[in-house]
Every structure is written in C-alpha cells, then in structure tokens.
Swiss-Prot record:
Subcellular location per the Swiss-Prot or TrEMBL entry: Cytoplasm
Protein name as it appears in the record: Endoribonuclease YbeY
Gene transcribed to yield this protein: ybeY
InterPro entries registered for this protein in UniProt: MetalPrtase_cat_dom_sf_prd, YbeY, YbeY_CS
The protein's role, per its UniProt record: Single strand-specific metallo-endoribonuclease involved in late-stage 70S ribosome quality control and in maturation of the 3' terminus of the 16S rRNA.
Keywords: Cytoplasm, Endonuclease, Hydrolase, Metal-binding, Nuclease, Ribosome biogenesis, rRNA processing, Zinc
C-alpha cells in the first residue's frame, strides 16, 4: 500500500485533475516493482508538493544553494544506494546484496521522502519539448522516485541506467522515451 499526501500550493495545478493520488500511487507502485528489495515492505509513504516558481526557487536555494527555479526537487527520507538494489526481471544492472533496511525501523513500512514539483517550469518544458504536461509530470515523478531510492546521475553509467529504467516504466504507461525528443 502506498500512502500519498499531496499539498497543492498553486492554483494552476487544479487544471490537471488527472494528476492525483491514484495516478501517483500507480506510478510509484510500478517504479518500486522494478526492484525485488521492496516486495516485502507492506506500506510506503510519499509526500508531494505541487507548487510554483517562487516556492521552488526558495527550496532550491535553501537546500541546494542554487538560486534558480527547477522542475522538481527530491528529498529522500533514507540513505539508499541503487547499487544495493536487486532489479526485478531486467538486466539493466543487478546486485545480489539485500538492501539494508535495519536503519529504517519497521521493515513493513518505508517513508520514501518528499518531492516538490514546479508547475511553471514543467509547463514551459512540456511546451518546449512538445510533450503533454501530464506525460512530462509522470516522467519527472518516476525520475524523482528513483532519486528517493538512491539513484543519481553523477556519471554516464548511472545516467544511462536511470534513463533506461525511466524509459521502461514510461513504456508500461504508453509514454514514449522522453530522451528521443531532447537529445
């Protein structure tokens, strides 16, 4: 089960009714199902902030010391490393090591973290990249969840693994690779 708390701090988000708890739960479940490590956890929690340029700028400055609006910020609740994850049924990358859950407390429950999305940046990017707002949001949600569970894109190898996972999950929802449009 996935519990999602959504805070909408910007009225423009209300124009996109299909971006709701049900969609976020479905995307989160599909993303987590890519890894055997999470199959034993019965309950996940995720907090979502849907906001605007002003608030995301403040958050980006406060937490990353970057004075610029961005499309999304991810705040993991746990220090996980993607290299400790066991991939379910794909050959993207694999480890036989169990993920370390002892420091998380109750292994039946996992708070994934918090994600803040900026309407204005996502809207502009989707327009520039000729994508629907919803498809771009879904891609960014998958990308952010991967960050919450320890993925990063600090080098070419990690970037490729992350992008391949995103493409695979997006395809499940009938969404084309976002990287074909921007590369």
């Amino acid at each position: 089960m996935i519990n999602v708390e959504i805070i909408k701090n910007y009225s423009k988000w209300r124009e996109h009714k299909q971006i709701n708890k049900a969609l976020i739960k479905k995307i989160t479940q599909k993303t987590l199902s890519q890894f055997d490590n999470f199959s034993e956890i019965k309950q996940f929690e995720l907090s979502i902030l849907l906001t605007n340029n002003e608030e995301i700028l403040t958050l980006n400055k406060q937490f990353r010391n970057i004075e610029k609006a961005t499309n999304v910020l991810s705040f993991p609740a746990n220090e996980l490393n993607w290299q400790d994850l066991r991939f379910s049924g794909n050959e993207i990358a694999s480890s036989n090591k169990p993920i370390i859950l002892e420091n998380l407390g109750d292994s039946d429950y996992m708070h994934l973290g918090d994600i803040a999305f900026c309407y204005d940046v996502i809207y502009n990017e989707s327009y520039e990249q000729q994508k629907t707002f919803e498809n771009h949001f879904i891609h960014l949600l998958i990308h952010s969840i991967l960050h919450l569970i320890g993925f990063d894109h600090q080098n070419d190898t990690e970037t490729k693994i992350m992008e391949n996972l995103e493409i695979e999950i997006l395809a499940h929802f009938g969404i084309s690779s976002p990287y074909l449009l921007i590369k």
